[in-house]
Amino acid sequence: MGQPLKVKKRIYSQDVELVRAHIFVRGKVQGVFFRQSMKDVANKYGVKGWVRNRRDGRTVEAVLEGPKDAVLKVIEWARVGPPGARVEDLEVKWEEYKGEFNDFSILPTE
């Protein structure tokens, strides 16, 4: 028999505020690696959720869940985005935290 698997799970202390933000980033945000870059930033800060392009060709939509300070860091990054992006507008809708994600995913365009 092999060794038992060791699973890493992030556990937050009870005084950490967990939040959910639904964001829309508009401008030159498609074709500049925005989604992959956001996934990398979200993973760096331990934020879960998803990101996808919208069919209008100028909007990226994302849902971010995690500790408030980490989610705010991802939103702060999204105000500028990766090199080559030109963010014209960022809309944030705060929603009730659901804890429904295990990771951060790139979803197909909708």
Swiss-Prot record:
Name of the protein in its database record: Acylphosphatase
Listed Gene3D superfamilies: 3.30.70.100
Reaction(s) the record says it catalyses: an acyl phosphate + H2O = a carboxylate + phosphate + H(+)
Species, as recorded: Pyrobaculum calidifontis (strain DSM 21063 / JCM 11548 / VA1)
Protein family (similarity comment): Belongs to the acylphosphatase family.
EC nos: 3.6.1.7
UniProt cross-references to Pfam families, sorted A to Z: Acylphosphatase
Keywords of the record: Hydrolase
GO molecular function terms listed in the Swiss-Prot or TrEMBL record: acylphosphatase activity
SUPFAM superfamilies for the chain: Acylphosphatase/BLUF domain-like
Superkingdom in the source lineage: Archaea
Domain Acylphosphatase-like per the UniProt entry, residue ranges: 20-108
InterPro entries noted in UniProt: Acylphosphatase (IPR020456), Acylphosphatase-like_dom (IPR001792), Acylphosphatase-like_dom_sf (IPR036046), Acylphosphatase_CS (IPR017968)
Catalytic residues (UniProt): 35, 53
